[in-house]
């Protein structure tokens, strides 16, 4: 039984046990494009990936299943070398602590995503980045594009083009890196992890 066959079984919930860690060669491989129209197995895998993200952000389910919270997941992280990513970016409460009107600022499964253009300006998260496949803290600015335009297909096989900036742009670049065999710390300056160039936008 392949990793994908196991993951898409109706009774299976993706947990941290399914997520491979750095050192596994799948994380360093360039993933294959999925065939269109999508097969049922690839649609199911995308749904399972999104289900994992929702569980990971739900305090009750996360504790029950022992999950680390995540806003994105790429198929190679569950040992399936295909160009499929899921993103689930929650909206935060306002300054008064009131819950947001919409739970998520971005919720999507992207098939064969590709960055088709990007800004000259770079950006990095002030607190750095983490990864479900990396069980350690790696400090430093992960330098990425401040704005990106991404083409992708949804589960219906419809093509989309989306323009992203800020945190959502960082998230999609992190996940697209995964399908290209790149890990976030590859983008940290090894000699000077917190190097700031004049044009670097630091996002809080």
Curated annotation (Swiss-Prot):
It catalyses: N-terminal N-formyl-L-methionyl-[peptide] + H2O = N-terminal L-methionyl-[peptide] + formate. The keyword Hydrolase applies. It comes from the Bacteria. The active site is at residue 175. It holds the Pfam family Pep_deformylase. Binds 1 Fe(2+) ion. Fe cation binds at residues 131, 174, 178. Gene3D superfamilies: Peptide deformylase. Keywords: Hydrolase, Iron, Metal-binding, Protein biosynthesis. SUPFAM superfamilies: Peptide deformylase. Its EC number is 3.5.1.88. Removes the formyl group from the N-terminal Met of newly synthesized proteins. Requires at least a dipeptide for an efficient rate of reaction. N-terminal L-methionine is a prerequisite for activity but the enzyme has broad specificity at other positions. This is Peptide deformylase. It comes from Streptococcus pyogenes serotype M1. The gene is def.
């Amino acid at each position: 039984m392949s990793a994908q066959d196991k993951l898409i079984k109706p009774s299976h919930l993706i947990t941290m046990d399914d997520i491979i860690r750095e050192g596994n060669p799948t994380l360093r491989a360039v993933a294959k494009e999925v065939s269109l129209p999508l097969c049922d197995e690839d649609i199911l895998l995308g749904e399972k990936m999104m289900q994992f993200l929702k569980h990971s952000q739900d305090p009750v389910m996360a504790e029950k299943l022992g999950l680390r919270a995540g806003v994105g997941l790429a198929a190679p992280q569950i040992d399936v070398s295909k160009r499929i990513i899921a993103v689930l970016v929650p909206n935060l409460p306002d300054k008064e602590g009131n819950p947001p009107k919409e739970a998520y600022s971005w919720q999507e499964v992207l098939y064969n995503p590709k960055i088709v253009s990007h800004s000259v300006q770079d950006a990095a998260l002030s607190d750095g980045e983490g990864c479900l496949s990396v069980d350690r803290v790696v400090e430093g600015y992960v330098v990425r594009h401040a704005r990106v335009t991404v083409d992708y297909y949804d589960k219906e096989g419809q093509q989309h083009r989306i323009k992203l900036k800020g945190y959502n742009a960082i998230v999609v670049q992190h996940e697209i890196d995964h399908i290209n065999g790149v890990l976030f710390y590859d983008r940290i300056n090894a000699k000077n992890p917190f190097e700031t160039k004049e044009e670097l936008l630091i996002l809080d």
